[in-house]
Amino acid sequence: NSLKYIFFSEDRLKIEYRDDEYVLLSNGHNVKPTQISLGERNIIALCYYFANIMQNQEFEESHAQEYILLIDDPVSSFDIENKVGIMSFLKYQLGLFLLGNINTKAIVMTHDLLTFYDLDKIYEELIENCNEKFSGDKMKFNRLEMAKQNIKQFEYKNRQEYTELIKIIYKYALGEAE
């Protein structure tokens, strides 16, 4: 069901269990993992990540436990259509876990500034929902970045990705970059 959710399609990518083995189908045809894109393989890995967490548990009970979720660059290698599906899927999954237990923590890392802004909006909405559900406890989230081998607060207001890249290129051209 997760693959349908991400691709907005019944047959786009599917995994079926047949004759004691798993079969990968793309648009109804058997394919090997090497025959699908890197982005599609990453989507399968992310779906497996969440499915594995809930293994041998009832759906309702699986989110009530405390978790630390760590997701590294969930939308790398995706075209725009898959990016929309994966961000929607992430919002849904993170919502289940964060609303399931006030102590659950979710760390999502990315190198892409546009993805960061999308995740920022998702987290703002999820935090608001969590604060409504857990009225006595207030959830918060941190926006952090690693720069020059240090982790610091991410100054995201008035920051433009292309401007930042041009500054880095300029400093490199002057020999000032590390």
Regions found by a protein language model. Give the residues of each.
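Catalytic Walker B motif of ABC-type/P-loop ATPase nucleotide-binding domains
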Residues: 59-64, 68-73
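Conserved D-loop-proximal element of ABC-family nucleotide-binding domains
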Residues: 64, 77-80, 84
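C-terminal lobe/lid and adjacent interdomain/linker elements of RecA-like ASCE P-loop ATPase modules
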Residues: 85-178
